[in-house]
């Protein structure tokens, strides 16, 4: 359930260009897939808007179709499981910025971005293993580290900053 820390001194466009394709690679079914995006408050809305715009551009379909950027989920249970996580987050106040629905055939689920996701949402506590990115703001480096480390497990973590001091403190 890899956290991603996005600091306000990062190159935001470059960061978005890197993280969106990585999130939706193999429909988010990668153990080190970036999932929990913690973004510094001063750039939070710009990040969410940019992520949503790029997410709308992720086309789903057959893996051999050159136009497809994302394929299906692994099995029949996954779309229902992802749908339940999205519905739970929305019921707890998250905003659905992109996607949020099952695809129209097979095991597809739309590439999805949820913003303002509270810690109480199930998706903030359990790996979705699917094409859902969740975002929440943070104020300080200490706040970001606490949010990233609040779960007892994780195989990867990512940070985006142009500041050497911030990088060294992490």
Tell me what each language-model feature is.
Residues 68-69, 106-110, 126-132, 151-155:
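Conserved glycine-rich beta-strand-loop-beta hairpin in the small C-terminal domain of fold type I
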Residues 94, 132-133:
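Short, conserved active-site loop motifs that form the nucleotide-linked donor/cofactor pocket
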Residues 159:
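Conserved SAM-binding loop
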Residues 120-125:
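Cytochrome P450 core scaffold surrounding the K-helix E-X-X-R motif
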Residues 135-139:
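Short acidic-hydrophobic, aromatic-tinged amphipathic segments that line or gate anion-handling sites
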Residues 1-119, 141-143, 147:
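ALDH superfamily catalytic-core signature
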């Amino acid at each position: 359930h890899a956290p991603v820390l996005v600091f306000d001194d990062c190159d935001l466009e470059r960061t978005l260009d890197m993280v969106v394709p990585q999130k939706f690679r193999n429909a988010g079914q990668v153990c080190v897939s970036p999932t929990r995006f913690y973004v510094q408050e001063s750039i939070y809305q710009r990040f969410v808007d940019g992520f949503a715009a790029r997410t709308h551009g992720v086309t789903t379909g057959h893996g051999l179709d050159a136009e497809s950027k994302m394929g299906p989920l692994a099995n029949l249970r996954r779309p229902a499981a992802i749908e339940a996580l999205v519905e739970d987050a929305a019921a707890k106040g998250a905003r659905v910025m992109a996607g949020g629905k099952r695809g129209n055939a097979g095991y597809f689920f739309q590439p999805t971005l949820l913003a303002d996701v509270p810690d109480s949402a199930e998706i903030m506590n359990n790996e979705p293993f699917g094409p859902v990115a969740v975002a929440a703001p943070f104020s300080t480096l200490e706040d970001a580290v606490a949010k990233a480390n609040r779960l007892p497990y994780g195989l990867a973590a990512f940070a985006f900053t142009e500041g050497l001091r911030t990088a060294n403190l992490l």
